[in-house]
Amino acid sequence: MMEEKQSHYLFGIHPVTEAIRAGRKFEKILIRKGASGPQFTELLKLAEEKELPVQFVPAEKMNSLVRGAHQGVIAYISQIEYVPFEEMVEGALSRKAAPLFLILDGVTDVRNLGAIARSAECAGVDGIVLPAKGGAAINAEAVKSSAGALLRVPVAKVSNLKVAMFYFRDSDFQIVAASEKAEDDMYDVNLRKPTAIVMGSEGHGISEPVLSLCTVGARIPMNGEIGSLNVSVAAAIILFEAVRQRR
Protein backbone atom coordinates (compact mmCIF):
# COMPACT_ATOMS: atom_id res chain seq x y z
CA MET A 1 0.00 0.00 0.00
CA MET A 2 2.84 2.36 0.84
CA GLU A 3 4.41 1.87 -2.61
CA GLU A 4 1.11 2.66 -4.30
CA LYS A 5 0.72 5.82 -2.22
CA GLN A 6 4.24 7.01 -2.94
CA SER A 7 3.53 7.08 -6.68
CA HIS A 8 1.27 10.05 -5.97
CA TYR A 9 4.01 12.14 -4.35
CA LEU A 10 7.31 13.73 -5.17
CA PHE A 11 9.50 14.36 -2.15
CA GLY A 12 12.81 15.90 -1.22
CA ILE A 13 13.57 19.60 -1.30
CA HIS A 14 15.78 19.53 -4.41
CA PRO A 15 13.53 17.33 -6.60
CA VAL A 16 10.43 19.35 -5.72
CA THR A 17 12.16 22.70 -6.28
CA GLU A 18 13.50 21.61 -9.67
CA ALA A 19 10.12 20.18 -10.68
CA ILE A 20 8.44 23.53 -9.94
CA ARG A 21 11.10 25.34 -11.96
CA ALA A 22 10.41 22.94 -14.84
CA GLY A 23 6.71 23.80 -14.76
CA ARG A 24 5.39 20.66 -13.04
CA LYS A 25 1.95 21.14 -11.53
CA PHE A 26 1.24 20.04 -7.98
CA GLU A 27 -2.03 19.91 -6.05
CA LYS A 28 -0.29 21.14 -2.92
CA ILE A 29 3.08 21.08 -1.21
CA LEU A 30 3.60 19.91 2.36
CA ILE A 31 6.48 21.46 4.30
CA ARG A 32 7.57 20.37 7.74
CA LYS A 33 6.63 22.78 10.50
CA GLY A 34 9.64 24.74 11.66
CA ALA A 35 11.66 24.11 8.49
CA SER A 36 14.01 26.99 7.67
CA GLY A 37 17.03 27.89 5.60
CA PRO A 38 17.76 29.32 2.15
CA GLN A 39 16.53 26.24 0.27
CA PHE A 40 13.15 26.40 1.97
CA THR A 41 12.98 30.15 1.35
CA GLU A 42 13.61 29.57 -2.35
CA LEU A 43 11.01 26.80 -2.48
CA LEU A 44 8.37 28.98 -0.83
CA LYS A 45 9.13 31.83 -3.22
CA LEU A 46 8.73 29.56 -6.25
CA ALA A 47 5.50 28.08 -4.90
CA GLU A 48 4.07 31.56 -4.40
CA GLU A 49 5.07 32.63 -7.91
CA LYS A 50 3.39 29.56 -9.40
CA GLU A 51 0.35 29.91 -7.11
CA LEU A 52 0.85 26.45 -5.62
CA PRO A 53 -0.84 25.82 -2.26
CA VAL A 54 1.56 25.20 0.64
CA GLN A 55 0.65 23.56 3.93
CA PHE A 56 2.89 23.30 7.00
CA VAL A 57 2.46 19.97 8.79
CA PRO A 58 4.13 18.02 11.63
CA ALA A 59 7.00 15.70 10.77
CA GLU A 60 4.95 12.74 12.02
CA LYS A 61 2.35 13.22 9.30
CA MET A 62 5.02 13.45 6.61
CA ASN A 63 6.69 10.29 7.87
CA SER A 64 3.36 8.47 7.61
CA LEU A 65 2.95 9.45 3.96
CA VAL A 66 6.25 8.39 2.45
CA ARG A 67 9.07 6.04 3.24
CA GLY A 68 12.51 7.58 2.85
CA ALA A 69 14.29 10.88 3.29
CA HIS A 70 11.64 13.43 2.38
CA GLN A 71 13.79 16.26 3.84
CA GLY A 72 10.67 18.01 5.07
CA VAL A 73 9.07 18.46 1.64
CA ILE A 74 6.35 16.37 -0.01
CA ALA A 75 4.44 17.49 -3.12
CA TYR A 76 1.16 15.96 -4.29
CA ILE A 77 1.39 15.19 -7.99
CA SER A 78 -1.58 16.40 -10.05
CA GLN A 79 -3.63 13.52 -11.39
CA ILE A 80 -5.12 15.53 -14.27
CA GLU A 81 -4.07 18.17 -16.77
CA TYR A 82 -5.70 21.49 -15.94
CA VAL A 83 -6.82 23.81 -18.72
CA PRO A 84 -6.44 27.61 -18.76
CA PHE A 85 -9.66 29.19 -17.50
CA GLU A 86 -10.19 31.73 -20.27
CA GLU A 87 -9.34 29.17 -22.94
CA MET A 88 -11.92 26.80 -21.45
CA VAL A 89 -14.67 29.43 -21.47
CA GLU A 90 -13.92 30.79 -24.93
CA GLY A 91 -13.70 27.28 -26.35
CA ALA A 92 -17.15 26.44 -25.02
CA LEU A 93 -18.60 29.69 -26.38
CA SER A 94 -17.22 28.87 -29.81
CA ARG A 95 -18.98 25.49 -29.77
CA LYS A 96 -22.41 26.37 -28.42
CA ALA A 97 -24.70 29.30 -27.69
CA ALA A 98 -25.35 28.50 -24.02
CA PRO A 99 -22.49 26.72 -22.25
CA LEU A 100 -22.93 25.36 -18.74
CA PHE A 101 -20.16 25.61 -16.14
CA LEU A 102 -19.80 24.63 -12.52
CA ILE A 103 -17.91 26.69 -9.91
CA LEU A 104 -16.96 24.96 -6.65
CA ASP A 105 -16.40 27.37 -3.77
CA GLY A 106 -14.62 25.62 -0.91
CA VAL A 107 -15.65 22.01 -1.58
CA THR A 108 -12.93 20.19 0.38
CA ASP A 109 -13.96 16.53 0.45
CA VAL A 110 -12.33 14.57 -2.38
CA ARG A 111 -15.22 12.10 -2.59
CA ASN A 112 -17.72 14.92 -2.95
CA LEU A 113 -15.54 16.47 -5.63
CA GLY A 114 -15.40 13.17 -7.50
CA ALA A 115 -19.15 12.63 -7.25
CA ILE A 116 -19.84 16.18 -8.45
CA ALA A 117 -17.53 15.70 -11.43
CA ARG A 118 -19.29 12.45 -12.32
CA SER A 119 -22.67 14.19 -12.35
CA ALA A 120 -21.18 17.11 -14.29
CA GLU A 121 -19.85 14.81 -17.01
CA CYS A 122 -23.19 13.01 -17.28
CA ALA A 123 -24.97 16.37 -17.55
CA GLY A 124 -22.67 17.59 -20.32
CA VAL A 125 -21.09 20.40 -18.29
CA ASP A 126 -18.51 22.33 -20.30
CA GLY A 127 -16.06 22.77 -17.44
CA ILE A 128 -15.46 22.94 -13.71
CA VAL A 129 -13.78 25.91 -12.02
CA LEU A 130 -11.85 25.32 -8.78
CA PRO A 131 -9.96 27.70 -6.49
CA ALA A 132 -6.21 27.18 -6.33
CA LYS A 133 -6.45 27.29 -2.54
CA GLY A 134 -9.17 26.14 -0.19
CA GLY A 135 -10.58 23.25 -2.21
CA ALA A 136 -10.17 19.49 -2.44
CA ALA A 137 -7.07 18.13 -4.10
CA ILE A 138 -7.65 16.17 -7.27
CA ASN A 139 -5.85 13.05 -6.15
CA ALA A 140 -6.26 9.40 -7.10
CA GLU A 141 -9.22 9.02 -4.72
CA ALA A 142 -11.03 11.95 -6.33
CA VAL A 143 -10.46 10.52 -9.81
CA LYS A 144 -11.70 7.11 -8.66
CA SER A 145 -14.79 8.63 -7.01
CA SER A 146 -15.56 10.41 -10.26
CA ALA A 147 -15.52 7.11 -12.20
CA GLY A 148 -12.97 8.75 -14.50
CA ALA A 149 -15.07 11.86 -15.14
CA LEU A 150 -12.25 14.13 -13.91
CA LEU A 151 -10.21 12.85 -16.85
CA ARG A 152 -12.97 13.87 -19.27
CA VAL A 153 -14.45 17.15 -18.03
CA PRO A 154 -12.23 20.23 -18.50
CA VAL A 155 -11.08 21.56 -15.12
CA ALA A 156 -9.53 24.99 -14.53
CA LYS A 157 -7.89 26.22 -11.35
CA VAL A 158 -7.93 29.95 -10.67
CA SER A 159 -6.10 31.95 -8.03
CA ASN A 160 -9.20 34.05 -7.33
CA LEU A 161 -12.77 32.87 -7.91
CA LYS A 162 -14.00 36.47 -7.98
CA VAL A 163 -11.84 37.24 -11.01
CA ALA A 164 -13.29 34.20 -12.78
CA MET A 165 -16.81 35.32 -11.93
CA PHE A 166 -16.20 38.80 -13.32
CA TYR A 167 -14.98 37.11 -16.52
CA PHE A 168 -18.18 35.08 -16.72
CA ARG A 169 -20.27 38.20 -16.17
CA ASP A 170 -18.34 40.12 -18.84
CA SER A 171 -19.02 37.18 -21.18
CA ASP A 172 -22.80 37.51 -20.61
CA PHE A 173 -23.18 34.48 -18.35
CA GLN A 174 -25.65 34.39 -15.52
CA ILE A 175 -24.07 33.13 -12.29
CA VAL A 176 -26.46 31.01 -10.28
CA ALA A 177 -25.92 30.57 -6.55
CA ALA A 178 -27.27 27.16 -5.56
CA SER A 179 -28.39 27.88 -2.01
CA GLU A 180 -31.19 26.85 0.34
CA LYS A 181 -31.41 30.55 1.27
CA ALA A 182 -32.29 31.64 -2.28
CA GLU A 183 -35.72 33.17 -2.88
CA ASP A 184 -36.42 31.40 -6.19
CA ASP A 185 -36.98 27.68 -6.71
CA MET A 186 -34.62 26.25 -9.31
CA TYR A 187 -37.67 25.44 -11.47
CA ASP A 188 -38.33 29.18 -11.77
CA VAL A 189 -34.79 30.05 -12.87
CA ASN A 190 -34.06 30.05 -16.61
CA LEU A 191 -31.11 27.68 -16.96
CA ARG A 192 -31.20 27.72 -20.76
CA LYS A 193 -28.96 30.79 -20.87
CA PRO A 194 -25.14 30.71 -20.71
CA THR A 195 -24.84 29.71 -17.07
CA ALA A 196 -22.25 29.14 -14.35
CA ILE A 197 -23.66 27.38 -11.28
CA VAL A 198 -21.91 27.95 -7.94
CA MET A 199 -21.88 25.23 -5.29
CA GLY A 200 -20.62 26.11 -1.81
CA SER A 201 -18.65 24.26 0.84
CA GLU A 202 -20.02 21.30 2.75
CA GLY A 203 -20.19 23.15 6.06
CA HIS A 204 -20.74 26.82 5.28
CA GLY A 205 -22.21 27.07 1.80
CA ILE A 206 -21.14 29.77 -0.64
CA SER A 207 -18.76 32.34 0.83
CA GLU A 208 -20.02 35.91 1.09
CA PRO A 209 -17.52 37.43 -1.41
CA VAL A 210 -18.49 34.84 -4.02
CA LEU A 211 -22.20 35.05 -3.24
CA SER A 212 -22.14 38.82 -3.73
CA LEU A 213 -21.10 38.31 -7.37
CA CYS A 214 -23.83 35.81 -8.23
CA THR A 215 -26.59 37.25 -10.40
CA VAL A 216 -29.41 34.91 -9.37
CA GLY A 217 -30.16 32.39 -6.63
CA ALA A 218 -31.73 28.97 -7.01
CA ARG A 219 -33.17 26.86 -4.21
CA ILE A 220 -33.89 23.14 -4.40
CA PRO A 221 -37.41 22.73 -2.95
CA MET A 222 -37.54 20.27 -0.05
CA ASN A 223 -40.30 18.94 2.17
CA GLY A 224 -38.31 17.34 5.00
CA GLU A 225 -37.05 18.73 8.28
CA ILE A 226 -33.28 18.57 7.68
CA GLY A 227 -33.31 21.37 5.13
CA SER A 228 -30.07 20.68 3.30
CA LEU A 229 -28.53 18.09 1.00
CA ASN A 230 -25.03 16.76 0.55
CA VAL A 231 -23.29 19.10 -1.89
CA SER A 232 -22.73 16.36 -4.46
CA VAL A 233 -26.41 15.42 -4.40
CA ALA A 234 -27.47 19.07 -4.65
CA ALA A 235 -25.12 19.61 -7.60
CA ALA A 236 -26.58 16.61 -9.43
CA ILE A 237 -30.15 17.83 -8.89
CA ILE A 238 -29.61 21.35 -10.18
CA LEU A 239 -27.42 20.20 -13.09
CA PHE A 240 -30.10 17.84 -14.29
CA GLU A 241 -32.73 20.54 -13.93
CA ALA A 242 -30.58 22.45 -16.42
CA VAL A 243 -30.51 19.36 -18.64
CA ARG A 244 -34.32 19.09 -18.41
CA GLN A 245 -34.82 22.73 -19.35
CA ARG A 246 -32.44 22.48 -22.29
CA ARG A 247 -34.06 19.42 -23.88
Regions found by a protein language model. Name each.
Residues P58, S78, D105, P131-A132, ...:
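Short beta->alpha connector loops at strand-helix junctions that form conserved
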Residues E60-L65, Y82-V83, L161-M165, D184, ...:
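A short acidic, often aromatic-flanked loop/helix-cap motif at beta-alpha or helix-coil junctions
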Residues V176-S232:
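Active-site/ligand-binding-proximal alpha/beta "capping" segment
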Residues M1-G91:
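N-terminal positively charged helical leader segments and presequences
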Residues E18-K25, E90-D185:
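RNA substrate-binding interface of SAM-dependent RNA methyltransferases
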Residues T17, A22-G23, E141-A149, E208-R247:
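Structured adenosyl-cofactor binding patch, chiefly the S-adenosyl-L-methionine
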